Amino acid sequence: MNINDDAFENEVFKSLLPVVVDFWAPWCGPCKMLSPVIDELEKEFAGRAKFVKMNIDDNSRTPTKYGI
Protein backbone atom coordinates (compact mmCIF):
# COMPACT_ATOMS: atom_id res chain seq x y z
CA MET A 1 0.00 0.00 0.00
CA ASN A 2 1.35 3.41 -0.96
CA ILE A 3 0.77 6.18 1.56
CA ASN A 4 1.40 9.91 1.68
CA ASP A 5 2.31 12.41 4.39
CA ASP A 6 -1.33 13.01 5.27
CA ALA A 7 -2.09 9.30 5.77
CA PHE A 8 1.10 8.39 7.66
CA GLU A 9 -0.18 8.83 11.21
CA ASN A 10 -3.42 6.91 10.63
CA GLU A 11 -1.82 4.09 8.64
CA VAL A 12 1.23 3.63 10.86
CA PHE A 13 0.63 4.85 14.42
CA LYS A 14 -3.05 3.99 14.60
CA SER A 15 -2.72 0.56 13.00
CA LEU A 16 -3.77 -2.43 15.06
CA LEU A 17 -1.03 -4.47 13.37
CA PRO A 18 2.75 -3.98 13.43
CA VAL A 19 3.76 -1.82 10.45
CA VAL A 20 6.82 -1.95 8.19
CA VAL A 21 7.36 1.33 6.34
CA ASP A 22 9.42 1.29 3.14
CA PHE A 23 10.67 4.81 2.48
CA TRP A 24 11.81 4.79 -1.15
CA ALA A 25 12.64 7.00 -4.14
CA PRO A 26 12.39 6.28 -7.88
CA TRP A 27 16.09 7.07 -8.38
CA CYS A 28 17.25 4.72 -5.58
CA GLY A 29 18.72 1.48 -6.96
CA PRO A 30 18.67 -0.43 -3.66
CA CYS A 31 15.04 0.66 -3.15
CA LYS A 32 14.11 -0.86 -6.51
CA MET A 33 15.88 -4.09 -5.58
CA LEU A 34 14.12 -4.28 -2.22
CA SER A 35 10.62 -3.58 -3.55
CA PRO A 36 9.85 -7.15 -4.73
CA VAL A 37 11.08 -8.51 -1.38
CA ILE A 38 8.74 -6.16 0.49
CA ASP A 39 5.88 -7.25 -1.79
CA GLU A 40 6.55 -10.92 -1.00
CA LEU A 41 6.77 -10.27 2.74
CA GLU A 42 3.47 -8.40 2.55
CA LYS A 43 1.84 -11.53 1.11
CA GLU A 44 3.56 -13.85 3.58
CA PHE A 45 2.54 -11.80 6.63
CA ALA A 46 -0.95 -10.84 5.45
CA GLY A 47 -3.22 -10.36 8.46
CA ARG A 48 -0.26 -10.35 10.87
CA ALA A 49 1.64 -7.25 9.75
CA LYS A 50 1.04 -4.26 7.55
CA PHE A 51 3.47 -3.05 4.89
CA VAL A 52 3.31 0.48 3.51
CA LYS A 53 5.48 2.37 1.05
CA MET A 54 6.17 6.09 0.93
CA ASN A 55 7.84 7.86 -1.99
CA ILE A 56 10.12 10.37 -0.28
CA ASP A 57 10.33 12.59 -3.37
CA ASP A 58 6.57 13.10 -3.36
CA ASN A 59 6.22 13.21 0.44
CA SER A 60 9.03 15.10 2.13
CA ARG A 61 7.32 16.11 5.38
CA THR A 62 7.32 12.67 7.06
CA PRO A 63 10.90 11.64 6.16
CA THR A 64 12.16 15.04 7.30
CA LYS A 65 10.29 14.77 10.59
CA TYR A 66 11.82 11.35 11.34
CA GLY A 67 15.30 12.01 9.92
CA ILE A 68 15.06 9.68 6.93
Language model segments and positions:
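Thiol-based oxidoreductase modules, predominantly thioredoxin-like and allied folds used
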Residues: 2-5, 23, 35-61, 68
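Hydrophobic heptad-repeat coiled-coil signature
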Residues: 28-31
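Short active-site neighborhood of thiol/selenol oxidoreductases, capturing the structured segment around
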Residues: 15-26
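Structural alpha-helical scaffold elements that stabilize or flank donor/cofactor-binding regions
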Residues: 11-13, 62, 67
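N-terminal leader/targeting and pre-domain segments
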Residues: 1-17
